[in-house]
Every structure is written in C-alpha cells, then in structure tokens.
Amino acid sequence: MSACRALRRPHSRRRSTVLAAGAALAALTLTACGSGNTSGGGGQTGFVQGAGGVDVVKDKGGRQSAPDLSGKTLDGKDLDVAEAYKGKIVVLNVWGSWCAPCRAEAKNLVAVANAYKDKGVEFVGLNTRDPDPAPALAFEKEFKVPYPSLYDSSGKLLLRFPKGSLNPQAIPSTVLIDRDGKIAARAIKPLGEDELREALDPLVAEK
C-alpha cells in the first residue's frame, strides 16, 4: 500500500504543476487583451483621470518625453515616429490581430484618424505579440487602416515607455503624444470614437 502511495505522489505533483501553469497562462492572456486595468505600474507620471477613462497630464511642463519609437513597419518600411511626425500630435495605438477588443476598437480609430488628418494629428499602430506580420496585415486590410504600424512582436518598443505610463500586459492601449513629443494622455482600454475625440480636442487646441 505504501508503495502505491509513493507512486501516486509524483503524478499528483506533476498534475498540480501543470494545472498551476495553465491557470497562470490563462490569467496572463486575460490581462493582456481587453483588461480594464488602468494601472501602468509605479512612477511619477502626472496622470489624472479624465473623461471616458482616459488619463491625462494637463500640465504641459509635467509631461514625460515619449521614447524612441523607430523600426520596421508591418510592410517592412523604416519608420521613426519622432522624425516623420515632428510637430504633429501622434496617436499611438498598441494592438494585436489576436486581440478581440482590438478588433472591436479598430473602426473607431480609423474613423477618427480620417477625421483628424487635416488637424495635424497622425496615427501610428504598435503591433505586438503577432509572431508573423501576415495576420496583422490581414487585420489592417479588413478594417481599412489608413496609417502604418510598427512591428513589435517581442514588445521591445512597448517596454521603452516610462515606468507607469503604460501597462505592457494591457492590450489594446492608446497613448497621445503632443506636438513637443511628450506623453499627454493614455487609455489602458479599448476606446470609443467619442472618447478619443474628447481626448484629442484639447491637444489640438493647445498652442
């Protein structure tokens, strides 16, 4: 009898380990796509909650600089956001083709991108965790996305953001960068069209 118990214990331990690993992976997946968590970690970011769950930094002097966002786009072109869109307001959306809330949000981003193009506002995507560009390119074609996306499968560019400004596990996320290249607002959630317009209008009006 004791021999049977001895044989069962390793199997039981292995099963517990597998179950625990599976639960951890499921939790990470849920957090990574469509999480309502608005925490971006520690750090003094100056964000205050604004309308529609968009966090803003109203004091221009308290805004942090956006990181270097340069690399290859999904279609293989070089893009340096700071250089290409100098003096423009930039809406940076973090997304993945695998993310259902990103799909729901896409039409809102496309509508606002088209509406604000003549107001000095540029949109850029940051595609993450897609192991191959093909599904992401299909996503862009399906939703008629008019702006480029940097391809960041490993999350390297995402991790360059100042501590506390973004939660790398919360996808989709959106960051608004002012004309001086400073982080002015963020949303750690999918955005509606009206929410994005309300966040952009004060930046467009800034002198």
Residue ranges and their predicted role:
Residues 68-90:
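A short beta-strand-turn-helix
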Residues 1-70, 206-207:
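N-terminal targeting signals for export/organelle localization
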Residues 33, 99-102:
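Short cysteine clusters
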